[in-house]
C-alpha cells in the first residue's frame, strides 16, 4: 500500500482533476483506492459525487482535531473500489486551532499509521488531494506520503512555480520525511496548437528527464464539465480526449511500480 499526494502550490493546474481521475482509472483496474480530500474547498469530495457541506466532524477535519478515527469517516462513493474521506471549509481553521501543538505536522501521519495498523484496510493506494498553497495541511500531506505526483500546467511561469515546490519538498525531506520522493510530473492543460505548451514540455523534459510522464493531459471541455456532474471524466465521457489521456496516465502510473524507490 502506498500513500501518494497530488500536489502543486499553484491553483488551477488540474490537481483535483488528476486525483479523481487517477483514482477512477486505478479502481477500474481492480485496485482499491482511498481518496483523502485535504483541501478545504472540497472539490475532490464534490467531484466524486459527495456533499462538502455536511457535519465537519464526519470529514477529515474530525480526524485531525481528534474527534473521530479514520475508520469512522470513510465513505463509499458511487464507484466500485473507490472510497473517500471528505472535506469542507471548516478544515481551513485547523492551522489556528493547532497553533500550540509542536508536533502538528505529524497529526495526519499518526492517524493514518494507527488506522493502517489497527484495521483490515486493504487499499492499494491512498491518494491525497492537497490544498493549492503551502500551509499546514500541505505539510501534513508531505510528511504522510511515500511519494508525490506533481501536475504541471503547460503555461507560462509554470516551471518557475515548480522550482519553488522542489525547494519545499527538499526542506521537508531534510527535516520531516527523508524517504519522500517525486513519483512523477504530469503535464496538464496541454494545447498542441500552442507553441508555449510545446516549449514548457521541452524545458520540463530537459530539466527533469524521466520524472516527466510520457502522457500529457490536454485542455478538454468534457474534462472541465465532469466535476459539476459529480463524476470523473473517465465515467462521464470515456471516449473524450481527456478520458483517453487519463486512461493512458493510469497505465503509465501502474507500470512505474518496479522503480518506485528512486530519489526525487
Tell where the protein language model's regions lie, with residue ranges.
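P-loop NTP-binding core
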Residues: 1-264
Amino acid at each position: 500500500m502506498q500513500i501518494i499526494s497530488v500536489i502543486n502550490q499553484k491553483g488551477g493546474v488540474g490537481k483535483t482533476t488528476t486525483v479523481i481521475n487517477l483514482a477512477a482509472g486505478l479502481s477500474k483496474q481492480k485496485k482499491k483506492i482511498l481518496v483523502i480530500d485535504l483541501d478545504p474547498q472540497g472539490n475532490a469530495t464534490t467531484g466524486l459525487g459527495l456533499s462538502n457541506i455536511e457535519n465537519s466532524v464526519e470529514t477529515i477535519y474530525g480526524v485531525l482535531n481528534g474527534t473521530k478515527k479514520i475508520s469512522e469517516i470513510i465513505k463509499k462513493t458511487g464507484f466500485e473500489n473507490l472510497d473517500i474521506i471528505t472535506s469542507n471549509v471548516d478544515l481551513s481553521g485547523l492551522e489556528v486551532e493547532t497553533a500550540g501543538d509542536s508536533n502538528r505536522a505529524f497529526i495526519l501521519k499518526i492517524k493514518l499509521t494507527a488506522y493502517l495498523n489497527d484495521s483490515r484496510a486493504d487499499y492499494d493506494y491512498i491518494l491525497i488531494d492537497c490544498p493549492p498553497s503551502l500551509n499546514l495541511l500541505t505539510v501534513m500531506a508531505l510528511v504522510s506520503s511515500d511519494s508525490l505526483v506533481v501536475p504541471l500546467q503547460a503555461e507560462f511561469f509554470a516551471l518557475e512555480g515548480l522550482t519553488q515546490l522542489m525547494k519545499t519538498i527538499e526542506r521537508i525531506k531534510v527535516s520531516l520525511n527523508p524517504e519522500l520522493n517525486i513519483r512523477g510530473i504530469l503535464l496538464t492543460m496541454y494545447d498542441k496548437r500552442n507553441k508555449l505548451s510545446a516549449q514548457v514540455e521541452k524545458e520540463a523534459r530537459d530539466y527533469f528527464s524521466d520524472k516527466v510522464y510520457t502522457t500529457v493531459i490536454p485542455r478538454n471541455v468534457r474534462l472541465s464539465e465532469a466535476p459539476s456532474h459529480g463524476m470523473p471524466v473517465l465515467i462521464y465521457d470515456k471516449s473524450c480526449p481527456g478520458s483517453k489521456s487519463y486512461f493512458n496516465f493510469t497505465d503509465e502510473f501502474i507500470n512505474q511500480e518496479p522503480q518506485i524507490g528512486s530519489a526525487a
